[in-house]
Regions:
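His-Asp-centered metal-binding catalytic motifs of divalent-metal-dependent phosphohydrolases/nucleases
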Residues: 73, 119-137, 146, 233-239
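Secondary-structure capping and boundary motifs in well-ordered enzyme cores
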Residues: 116-122, 142, 227, 278
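Inter-helical turn/loop segments and adjacent helix faces that build the functional surface
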Residues: 140, 154-166, 208-226
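Active-site flanking loop/helix segments enriched in acidic
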Residues: 48-79, 133-134
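Short alpha-helical hairpin
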Residues: 27-56
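Divalent metal-dependent phosphate-bond-processing catalytic cores, especially two-metal-ion Mg2+/Mn2+ enzymes
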Residues: 2-25, 82-118, 130, 159, ...
Length: 371
């Protein structure tokens, strides 16, 4: 088994999110007119997954901002859509469309709301996949650069789609005239032979030449602009999470021991279940879920220690001082999570961060002045 295949087994949700996006960006028949060689849907998809996602998120300077970070975010998105959902405002991003709550009310079937209903799920997935696609701890414009790469990806997919559509039309029409059944075969994807399961098999998720296939993004100029601008905007908002105001203020209560609790927002509570959340807020909350991990040791190993590795170019004292200062500033904000569903993590997140600051401060006190 190759290293890439081994990595793929750890990121089934990343693969599923990618497949769901590409199915709305590329036609299932693709012929490369530049080389006059046949390139099927799977080949084109895999080529760009390696180029835009895998190769970037496996760069050596990354320890926390990796494919596993995306996998965790998508796992929380799956749980959110299963337990809460969009109350009919948007098609689900990861859940199957058969979920009853996804049926739109009549007033959402036209205009801008219709575009948002149809395409917000893709915006969420693209934002997750691309929000850290550029990550260099020594530069301050990672978010801006990541947004540019996301736009570049969409432009690339649009060109690929146009090439495939233009070159495939004549070929498919000729085959169709000779044999209608051969036309379907000419667009079929090869069986999966790379060791990945059915979850990752694009041909099973999106059967070839199906008249039930949803239209590609590019057939609607308004939708194309919506996806491009919204995805870039979402990514740019991760530069300063807490500058985005929540829809409603949510409050922690102080426990008898002096800590915080958000027990009033238990799963299934009216506040959680009745909230109609802004997808941007959900996306930003997904990015911060690691802070509220229920196990403090896991928080330390998977987040705090890996962030420290990413900033190993700083001296020990400079890192300890800078990290503690950053977290103290973060803690001053009254509300970290913007949606009631994820606000349930707030008390635990503050506990984890407070303990990290305490550990950083204690270690800094032991560092010789010259370090």
């Amino acid at each position: 088994m190759s290293v890439a295949q081994s990595a793929d087994e750890r990121i089934p949700l990343v693969r599923r999110a990618w497949a769901r996006c590409v199915a709305r960006l590329l036609p299932l028949c693709a012929t490369d007119t530049r080389t006059l060689s046949s390139r099927n849907f799977r080949d084109v998809s895999e080529e760009h997954f390696r180029r835009f996602i895998y190769n970037r998120y496996t760069e050596p300077q990354r320890h926390y901002h990796t494919l596993e970070h995306l996998e965790e975010m998508l796992g929380h998105l799956v749980a959110y859509e299963a337990e809460h959902g969009w109350h009919g405002a948007y098609k689900p991003a990861m859940a199957e469309e058969s979920v009853s709550s996804s049926t739109p009310p009549p007033e959402l079937l036209t205009g801008e709301d219709s575009v948002a209903y149809e395409w917000t799920g893709m915006v969420l997935l693209l934002s997750v996949l691309f929000h850290d696609v550029v990550y260099d701890p020594t530069r301050s414009d990672n978010e801006e650069a990541s947004a540019v790469v996301a736009a570049e990806f969409l432009e690339t997919m649009q060109r690929e789609s146009e090439l495939a559509s233009n070159s495939s039309f004549g070929a498919v029409a000729a085959v169709s005239a000779a044999s209608p059944t051969s036309m379907v075969a000419s667009c079929a994807l090869p069986p999966a032979s790379d060791g990945r399961g059915a979850e990752d098999d694009v041909s099973q998720q999106h059967p070839p030449f199906s008249y039930s296939e949803p239209p590609l993004l590019w057939v609607d100029a308004q939708a194309t602009d919506f996806v491009r601008t919204s995805t870039m905007s979402y990514i740019l908002k991760t530069k300063e999470h807490l500058s985005v105001e929540p829809k409603q203020p949510l409050y922690l209560t102080v426990s008898a021991g002096g800590g915080f609790t958000s027990a009033e927002l238990r799963r299934g509570s009216d506040v959680v279940q009745q909230s109609r959340d802004d997808p941007l807020h959900v996306f930003l909350d997904l990015d911060l879920t690691i802070l509220g991990h229920p196990d403090e040791d896991t928080y330390r190993r998977r987040y705090a220690e890996n962030i420290r590795r990413e900033y190993s170019h700083y001296s020990r004292a400079d890192f300890l001082r800078g990290r503690a200062e950053f977290l103290r500033g973060f803690a001053q904000h009254p509300q970290w999570y913007k949606t009631p569903y994820f606000f349930r993590l707030e008390a635990r997140a503050r506990h984890n961060v407070a303990h990290e600051v305490k550990a950083l401060t204690a270690e800094l006190a032991e560092v010789p002045v010259a370090c």
